[in-house]
């Protein structure tokens, strides 16, 4: 199994660019930049895309331009066009159940109430077996505050921790493409950024 598509979940527009809910897109933007690429809008895939060669593998990047709860439209359009199977897809997203400074890789599982993951699963024929990169953003402590929290910007103390976790996830993506998911998972899942 090789990852052929990495998706960064986000809401479109400048007003959302720095919000916690866009952490997945921060990762994909940084991955493109790390490899000297920039994402370009491709309307037939409802998003911004780029193509990389990583460890000898062809890899496509996607940041949907749909709203978060319609992310599956972009993912299924690109995956369908290039015949990419669900288990060859890695979706990077913000994760309330992990603190800032932590990021973890996993295959399948629930959607944790994340509307982007929900829509992707449903548009992939209700198949949850795609990989996820869960980027910790922390939790506001009260369910009723979640929407305001994910659509808010990280605190000044949290942003460097999230950035460090994304940096480690970038290094682990190189490892993933070279040595496989298990090695990348073992390394990333043990990482925790320390406060500066």
Swiss-Prot record:
It comes from the Bacteria. The keyword Hydrolase applies. Its EC number is 3.1.1.29. It is found in: Cytoplasm. InterPro entries: Pept_tRNA_hydro, Pept_tRNA_hydro_CS, Pept_tRNA_hydro_sf. Gene3D superfamilies: Peptidyl-tRNA hydrolase (3.40.50.1470). The record marks 94 as: Stabilizes the basic form of H active site to accept a proton. GO terms for molecular function: peptidyl-tRNA hydrolase activity; tRNA binding. It catalyses: an N-acyl-L-alpha-aminoacyl-tRNA + H2O = an N-acyl-L-amino acid + a tRNA + H(+). GO terms for biological process: protein quality control for misfolded or incompletely synthesized proteins; rescue of stalled ribosome. Monomer. This is Peptidyl-tRNA hydrolase. It comes from Edwardsiella ictaluri (strain 93-146). The lineage of its organism: Bacteria, Pseudomonadati, Pseudomonadota, Gammaproteobacteria, Enterobacterales. The gene is pth.
């Amino acid at each position: 199994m090789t990852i052929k598509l990495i998706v960064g979940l986000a809401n479109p527009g400048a007003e959302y660019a720095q919000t916690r809910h866009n952490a997945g897109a921060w990762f994909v933007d940084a991955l493109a930049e790390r490899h000297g690429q920039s994402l370009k809008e491709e309307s037939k895939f409802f998003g911004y895309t780029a193509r990389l060669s990583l460890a000898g593998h062809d890899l496509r990047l996607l940041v949907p331009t749909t709203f978060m709860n319609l992310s599956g439209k972009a993912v299924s359009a690109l995956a369908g066009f290039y015949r990419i199977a669900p288990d060859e897809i890695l979706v990077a997203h913000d994760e309330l159940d992990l603190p800032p400074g932590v990021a973890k890789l996993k295959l399948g599982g629930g959607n944790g109430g994340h509307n982007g993951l929900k829509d992707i699963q449903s548009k992939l024929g209700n198949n949850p077996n795609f990989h996820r990169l869960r980027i910790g953003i922390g939790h506001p402590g009260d369910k009723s505050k979640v929407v305001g929290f994910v659509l808010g910007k990280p605190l000044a103390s949290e942003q460097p921790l999230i950035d460090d976790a994304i940096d480690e996830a970038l290094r682990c993506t190189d490892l993933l493409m070279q040595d496989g998911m298990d090695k990348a998972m073992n390394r990333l899942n043990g990482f925790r950024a320390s406060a500066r």
